[in-house]
Amino acid sequence: MIEFQRLHKSYSVDGRQIVALHPLDLRIGPGEVFGIIGHSGAGKSTLIRLINRLEEPSGGRLLIGDEDVTALDSQGLRALRRRIGMIFQHFNLLSARTVAGNVAFPLELVGTPRAEIDARVAELLARVGLQEQANQYPAQLSGGQKQRVGIARALATGPQILLCDEATSALDPQTTASVLQLLAQINRELGLTIVLITHEMDVIRRVCDRVAVLDAGKLVETGPVTEVFLHPKHVTTRRFVSEAEHLDEAELHRDFAAVGGRIVRLTFLGNGTYEPVLGRIARDTGVDYNILSGRVDRIKDTPYGQLIVALTGGDQTAARAGFVAAGVQVEDLRV
């Protein structure tokens, strides 16, 4: 368990106090993949770097298990950091070392015997799929391969927590997907707690269990990804979701003006996503429907679908009740 208790961070710039992170309370459970999303300057990197005290808090407490991280001395902090791995947006690899040498580096720093280092490096390179690149140098690797080296290096000391600071921001979409699949696999197989920061809701949707949304240094929304993604409450969260779904709200409302009838958003979750509910209810109630927007996808391992439809004619009250009875969430956009 990682627990933030009124933790906050301020800087002094030219005699002025700049608040990077307002006091917040947050819990991250053991074995979770927890996402933190926000625009540039929202406080994401500050928050994640408080966990291993690369940033020093201005106040509040941070607990990892029963240990108060904010009270640790230098010796305790070194021990803590061996239990926390970290990967970065720009990889931070040592250019003069081979792939194997980069992965070995944290183990060399703590005096691990060479035979153990060699065995551990071989194991980690197999885990991230880079056995063939062991003797290559970072300049010879693709961006995705460099990040896989970063992941292997972060796992070298057997951490309990993995911090990912914009780990996919420098990668193309296909490589991003493969790196996220690797992180999900590591979470499943090793039981690591993963804390991931990003400015992309699509990254959160693919891999995270829960999410916190930051805006101007404040925690504005948090909860399970399915709930936050499908029913965003704060305006910042709604913007992130619209960007992920490639929805232009202004354009959508112009479409509303061009059609008649009652307009609703239908949300399907789980196996019901693939049931022919809309057609069945239309037949049963005599309601005609016009699909204005639609999407079927997954939130981590859970299928979901969203349709925005215009309903005309028939018994629309019965149709609405039929959707609810079938487990479909109904939101009226225009009655």
From Swiss-Prot:
**Which Pfam families does the annotation name?**
ABC_tran, NIL
Annotated ATP binding lies at G38, H39, S40, G41, A42, G43, K44, S45
Its main localization is membrane
Source domain of life is Bacteria
InterPro entries according to UniProt: AAA+_ATPase, ABC_transporter-like_ATP-bd, ABC_transporter-like_CS, ACT-like_dom_sf, MetN_ABC, MetN_ABC_transporter-like, NIL_domain, P-loop_NTPase
> How is it placed in the membrane, per its record?
Peripheral membrane protein
Q: Which reaction does it catalyse?
A: L-methionine(out) + ATP + H2O = L-methionine(in) + ADP + phosphate + H(+); D-methionine(out) + ATP + H2O = D-methionine(in) + ADP + phosphate + H(+)
Q: What class of enzyme is it?
A: translocase
Quote the EC number. Answer: 7.4.2.11
A molecular function GO annotation: ATP binding
Q: What does UniProt give as the signal peptide span?
A: none
A GO CC term assigned to this protein in UniProt: plasma membrane
Swiss-Prot/TrEMBL keywords: Amino-acid transport, ATP-binding, Cell inner membrane, Cell membrane, Membrane, Nucleotide-binding, Translocase, Transport
Location within or outside the cell: Cell inner membrane
Q: Where is the ABC transporter domain?
A: 2-241
Q: Which family does it belong to?
A: Belongs to the ABC transporter superfamily. Methionine importer (TC 3.A.1.24) family.
Tell me the PANTHER family matching this sequence.
Answer: AMINO ACID IMPORT ATP-BINDING PROTEIN, METHIONINE IMPORT ATP-BINDING PROTEIN METN
Subunit composition and interactions = The complex is composed of two ATP-binding proteins (MetN), two transmembrane proteins (MetI) and a solute-binding protein (MetQ).
Q: What does this protein do?
A: Part of the ABC transporter complex MetNIQ involved in methionine import. Responsible for energy coupling to the transport system.
Indicate what this protein is called per its UniProt record: Methionine import ATP-binding protein MetN
